[in-house]
Amino acid sequence: LRRWTRRRTRRHRRGVWALVGDIYSGLLTIVVVGTILVPHLSRLVAARPPSSSQEAADLGVLDLDPGWLVLALTMLLLILGIGPLSRLGPLFLRPHEAAWWLPMPGDRGTLLVPVARVEYLIAATAGAVMGVLPALASAGGWGAAVAWPVLIAAGTCLVLSELITAQVQGRGVTCLRRFLILFGAAACLAGTTFPFPRSMTGNVVVATLAGVLVAAGTLRWRQARLVLGHVRDDGLLTVVARSFGAHVSLLSLDTRAVGRLLSPALPRPAAPSPLRLARIGRRLPRSVRVLTGVAQADWILLRRQPRRLLQIGAGLAVAVLPLLSESVGIPMRALAYLAGGWIATLAVAEPARQAWFDGAADTSWPVSPWLVRVGHLLVPGLFMSAWSLLSLAPAMTSLGAAGAWKALGVVAALALVSGWAWAGAALRSGFRAMPDFAAGLVTSPVGSLPPGLVQMLVEGPDAALVGALATALVACGIAAPTTTVLGIQAAAGAVVILWGVRTNRRAS
């Protein structure tokens, strides 16, 4: 049956040499870009001073080794990735394969084994690439260069086996996610106590652990192979439709639709909501009642999506962990802080995205559209203000230990002000306009693109950069926490909030 499918679809394929050419072009691009960026990226990691651990201990701040930091961030990447992977299968078929194969009698296992093999190959390759980072951090020579990629590759294959088992059994990935969270937390705790394995003995321990994981991965693959035929057809058809929808959304450059497809369905409410916030504003003026009503709806939407809280925590980890390592350069800390803030902002931007998908609820309010937009700022502003306070905890701890109470107050005010700037960026990202494919395509070196593509891609990140740059500079130690910086942050936050309220006003 597989041979018949290949014959039927052969004329629609580009051929093996086209695939080889794509792989060659991709590898050549990676090599050229890496050769250009490596000398500059190496400057972002500072030399580890011998007294850094003692100074960090005096300030009450943890000092993480960069190797353990890389491992923790790798676990964080896996934690964020298993949700979308479980939505896409991981076992899946192409639409024509599902149409031709599933109606046939017989065992599904032999049809899905080649798919699983390719996915294991992709998982092992991705794990080996991620394993290069801890190998570079350990500076342990060829032993570390081999042991760490094998270790991470075996770990990703084990994660894939658990995802396949969860798909076959029809259960969620909550247990797997909790295990990865515990493992990442253990890496952070180990970084505060034990040095990263750099010696020959450490490389032997890593190689032994890699061998154990390879054996466990092989055993889990054999177990998963036996149950591949138990995958339900309706589950495969659902995955096929979801994968095809994600592919079409990527072709149309609609990242919001991709995120909606990869997100789990909202749970149905078990009981009516008490609507406490809306009840409080019942006796207030109409404009205030609308603000509280919009905020109440946004809070209900976020409360029904617990994964958003996990995403906010992941953004906090990305922003804070580099601040706890003395070996990470200041520019890299600033980039990590902005990246972590953007990850958290995407989580709290869900109400704005939902309002963009279905604007009927916003148009039903008896006030101006801009006031409804302001209501969508309240819940993200509160969440991101709390996030900013937690992200600036290392800086506030250092200032408190030094007795700089005025600077400590400025940092706390910066956190509160920057939280509303992040909320404005969330509003701008959620309500951004789509490119107009009907207006004709623009020829570019990477192909024909619709007008307005660049504007769509930068709407949101541009506001985040403008609104949070001052706070990021203070968090990384580049700028001192002064009232001048606070004034700059307040002005930038006001601009970003106005920016977000006025973004794509025609959609309201």
What spans do the regions from the language model cover?
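Hydrophobic alpha-helical transmembrane segments of membrane proteins
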Residues: 1-98, 107-360, 368-508
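Alpha-helical transmembrane segments that serve as single-pass membrane anchors or pore-forming helices
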Residues: 101-102
